[in-house]
């Protein structure tokens, strides 16, 4: 018959305690390893980005369209809403055309951005001659329309806490104005912007300004660069100047505008740091590049 001595009992107890401690440590380690996955960005949408994916004419999401009738739109001239078909919630962006322009001049950008996981409205303004501050009010009205008056297919896909604006020319000026009035916006992207006001020191919204080297209507010397310089440095901001481009570069499909607009919106509307790699340090400039100049307040 086997007899267990007090010393052996102590040894067995020590082994049991060590085994329990080891098991507990393993559980803690497993939980710690799983924690990053559980704490993943809830706004992250789509696959890991690549340069070729961002340069393509469309992104990973299939897109549907909805017409916003001029007669049903309150405060702006109607437009077209582009949204991902996949059921989920997304940030929402309103885009304004420039002076004398219509939504057709920015339609390519609306559809392209939507294909990367956003709900986008490309608007018509009340008149094609509307000035920048009027366009700011209309961009704001368009955001409200998507949240309250669009179909349920659109409304149910929008995260109302993640809104942004874009615009070309005077629409870009309107974008700056609205960004100065609505600090709750997540991002602003003025495209070859025009505005008589040159100082935007009250903007705290992350802002990407895209200018054009050969713009003779809103020259970068008188518009884009002073706008960028006036935004206070604590604000996340970037300035990208298109090489050899004119004022109307945003009116036709442009891979550089598309790529960096999407990257900016992903980084700041979706808080998706996977896109920081395209903004910091940013694109190559100079010979054989589509970008004449790039500067920013990196790191973001």
UniProtKB/Swiss-Prot annotation:
Optimum temperature is 50 degrees Celsius. Poly(ethylene terephthalate) binds at residues 99, 170, 194. Optimum pH is 6. Changing residue 194 to A: Decreases activity. It comes from the Bacteria. Can also bind other divalent metal ions with lower efficiency. Calcium ion binding contributes to the thermostability of the protein. This is Cutinase est2. Belongs to the AB hydrolase superfamily. Keywords: Calcium, Disulfide bond, Hydrolase, Metal-binding, Periplasm, Secreted, Serine esterase, Signal. It is found in: Secreted; Periplasm. GO terms for molecular function: cutinase activity; metal ion binding. Changing residue 169 to A: Abolishes activity. It comes from Thermobifida alba (Thermomonospora alba). SUPFAM superfamilies: alpha/beta-Hydrolases. The gene is est2. Monomer. Catalyzes the hydrolysis of cutin, a polyester that forms the structure of plant cuticle. Shows esterase activity towards p-nitrophenol-linked aliphatic esters (pNP-aliphatic esters). Capable of degrading the plastic poly(ethylene terephthalate) (PET), the most abundant polyester plastic in the world. Can also depolymerize the synthetic polyesters poly(epsilon-caprolactone) (PCL), poly(butylene succinate-co-adipate) (PBSA), poly(butylene succinate) (PBS), and poly(lactic acid) (PLA). Residues 1-39 form the signal peptide. Transmembrane segments: none annotated. Changing residue 217 to A: Decreases activity. One of its GO terms (cellular component) is periplasmic space. Induction: Expression is not induced by the synthetic polyester poly(butylene succinate-co-adipate) (PBSA).
């Amino acid at each position: 018959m086997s007899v267990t001595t007090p010393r052996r009992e102590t040894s067995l107890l020590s082994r049991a305690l060590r085994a329990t401690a080891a098991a507990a440590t393993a559980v803690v380690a497993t939980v710690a390893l799983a924690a990053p996955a559980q704490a993943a960005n809830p706004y992250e949408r789509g696959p890991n980005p690549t340069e070729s994916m961002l340069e393509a004419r469309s992104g990973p999401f299939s897109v549907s369209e909805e017409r916003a009738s001029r007669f049903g739109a309150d405060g702006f001239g109607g437009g077209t809403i582009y949204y991902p078909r996949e059921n989920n919630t997304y940030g929402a962006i309103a885009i304004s055309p420039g002076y004398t322009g219509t939504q057709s001049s920015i339609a390519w950008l609306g559809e392209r951005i939507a294909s990367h996981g956003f709900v986008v409205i490309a608007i018509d303004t009340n008149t094609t001659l509307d000035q920048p501050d009027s366009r700011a009010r209309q961009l704001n009205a368009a955001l409200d329309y998507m949240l309250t008056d669009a179909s349920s297919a659109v409304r149910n896909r929008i995260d109302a806490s993640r809104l942004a604006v874009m615009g070309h020319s005077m629409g870009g000026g309107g974008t700056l104005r609205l960004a100065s009035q609505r600090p709750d916006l997540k991002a602003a992207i003025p495209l070859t912007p025009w505005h008589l006001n040159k100082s935007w020191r009250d903007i705290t919204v992350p802002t990407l300004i895209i200018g054009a080297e050969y713009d003779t209507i809103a020259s970068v010397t008188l518009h884009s660069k002073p706008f960028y310089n006036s935004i206070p440095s604590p604000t996340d901001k970037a300035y990208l100047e298109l090489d050899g481009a004119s004022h109307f570069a945003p009116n036709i499909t442009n891979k550089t505008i598309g790529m960096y607009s999407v990257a900016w919106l992903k980084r700041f509307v979706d808080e998706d740091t996977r896109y920081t790699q395209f903004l910091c340090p940013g694109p190559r400039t100079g010979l054989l590049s589509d970008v004449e100049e790039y500067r920013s307040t990196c790191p973001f």
